[in-house]
Amino acid sequence: MLDKFTDYKSPIPPGVRLPEIKIDDRHYERLNIQKGCSNLDFLRQLCLNAVKSKGIDKKANKQEYYDRAKMELAVFEELGFVDYILLNWDIMNFAHENDIPTGYGRGSAAGSLILFLVSVTNVDPIEHGLFFERFVSKSRAKKTIVDGVTYLDGSLMPDVDNDIEFSKRQAVIDYIKTKYSGKTCKILTMNTLTGKLCIKECGKIVGEMSEDAVNAVSDVIPKQFGKVFALKDAYKQSEQFKAFCDSHQKVFKIAKKLEGLNKNCGVHPSGISISYFNNEDIMPLQKTGEGELVSAYEMNNISEITVKFDILGLRTLSVVYETCQRLGLDFKTLDYDSSSTYKYFQDLSNPKGLFQIEANTNFHVCRKVKPRNLFELACVLALARPGALDFMNQYAEYVETGNFQSIHPFFDDILGVTGGIPIFQEQLMKMVVKVGFTLDEAETVRRIIGKKKVSEMPAWKEKISNKIKENNLDPAISDVLWKVAEDSANYSFNASHAVSYATLSAVTTYLKFNYPQEFFLALLKSSKHEPNPHEEIETISQELAFFDIRLLSPDLVKSKSDFDIEDKNIRFGLNAIKGVSDKVLENLLAFRQKEFSDKIDCFDAAKEAGLNIGVLSSLIQAGTLSSFSEKRCRLALEAQSYNILTEREKRNIKLVASKYNFDVLKAIADLVKNKLAGDDAKPFMSEKRFTTFRAKYDSYKKIYEMNKTHEKFANWFFEKKLLGYSYTHKLRDVFSEEDEQRLLTTYEISQLDPRQPVKIVGVVKEAKKKTSKNGNKYLFIQISDEYGQMSCRLMDGREDKLTRYYEGGGKTPEEDDIVVLYGNKSDDSIFLDSLSILNEKIYTKLSDLQS
């Protein structure tokens, strides 16, 4: 970008000038550091203090730590990075001083001992064999000095990403904005047109194709590990897509031209820019809808003139911190790295809440590998990625047997620990060092191979060959090393990142299986931060039974604002119920302090809190007043009837309620029938008033009559709708049929051998017509029940099942439909013979009946 401004006098800085570090005076006294010392001396003293506080001065290999720290400090000073390290320390120190949990590390930064000493990371790089050069390499750093001022090449600067506890992330950002006022902003990103979108839109507009037709075409565009192929690659990989493109050349040609063009701009979700200069002096700015400043330079350009920080909110840290706080533990000093933790990976079936491991691919790899220590767990995370996944079975066999395939005896000590597979980029670096290069040079090789810098590869290939000759090594080593370098570029992973994240995976495993009640409580509390909180609650609730924990119903009398422990179980929090606003909740809790003696008190409190009768009726149907042991449909009718009454009529009902055991309907009926006088000696209701009351009451009564015939389903429906899960009835129990094939759950089906006949009822999460790689059309359905999820497929096959289903009037299920499915179990799905959509309906208002 700078090259475009050479004709202008200093339009922007010639590089990144680091923001001026403002170290608070209190730090000098607190850390016993002489005020007025240089930033380098301040950083050095921070490290010396940490050597004692972290017990490094007691280690047998303490000299290794001293030498490494000395080397890293020298490199930081030489390259001009001291202030950058202190910037990171200052931000993370603010978090630590304010009891804001931070992560163990992310990316290559975990390879720096200095960052570990100043608590920016919490993974010991020497203990885990991590390389500093993977984080900072002199061979790929550049600085310019202009008029005595140092400017850094932003594209070659180190990059520290910081994980912050999710709910406290904004506090850290506010600190940065306050301390560097006028010099911070968010960062612009550009969103581009995907090939899949282009082919669909061009198909509709240029090819005049229907929506179904273009969807069918886009479905055959291949994807690998969730990433959709570019159009030119899809053309080579898919015969079906190639056939379409050959017959619709104009559509394909235009779509290829549009693919990759900027569609719109966005804001980087975690990035924040900090500059030495005021923002308006060096860059154009714009404002978000919330009034926050955003650079008008996009992400790659702004890094050439300012420092970019990633402040990421990590929900897992919220869960870990909440769990530890309740137990009185310090999560940075947990005894998680022991055989007692890794035994849970030997037969893992409940991955919810385990950091990284709960993702489907990672879970699959973990079950296959069965890691026995932190290093093997790091290998699991590294293998669960495109390319690397091909080596899963090979590595799993090595873990089980200890046998591996040697590519050359010279490298066995490096590759033997990972089953002969260069799982980590650092292993390639070790191989390069072993033939005679420095770690800096090894990082250069890794970088040019990883970035596919084709023009630089031949020179380095020759250098390696010459170095091997110079050191009188086997000439075959040259070809072996270069092949590993080229191949591993497609799958090798950063060991620093893998170890950091594996540490958090191990911590969550330790907490979940040793303190399940506290861990699940924290998971449920954090569900509010998820994009779909109720879906998250449902997923969490599916595992609770395996730990002998019940998720007790929300109760307007017993529940607290948030989820809480009750005996050996967990009580649902009122703030997680759909339709209950923060204001209503606050009012409800305030009224509840005087204790509800009966349901009429509850009806009054709900109205005073601002809860409308529709929401209250739904809450009653969901069981939030079950402590009064009433039939829910009837209790809802009581609340609705009570709501119709005038204030005078309500007073009179309260006077006689105890006589009728607080049954509102009986009290109203008796008072009206016997024309009893109220507290003012007037009749309870005039005939005219009764006619008005009766008209409204009849509407509610009709709904009651309809729903009470399916009360079990009504209870399930409202629980699922408002809470995300059903605690009184399992879906299977609601629709069980004694005389027919037994309904199974997703868990029971998962335990069956393939080819077993199955019948299941579930809620549709997704349903879509698709086309297989072989060109066969099928209906894909993803369903869920209280135990998990399962994918199902209805295909034609020899019996034309799909065709017969639609010709017989069958419809594609919609999200949240309830379906009964019949078929046979495959490895991890069901191949369907037939399906039926259940038409049971719950009525919530009179218009439902009229329609």
Residue map of PLM features:
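Charged alpha-helix within mobile-element recombinases
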Residues: 1-2
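Noncatalytic, beta-rich nucleic-acid-contacting surfaces in large DNA/RNA-processing enzymes
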Residues: 5-851
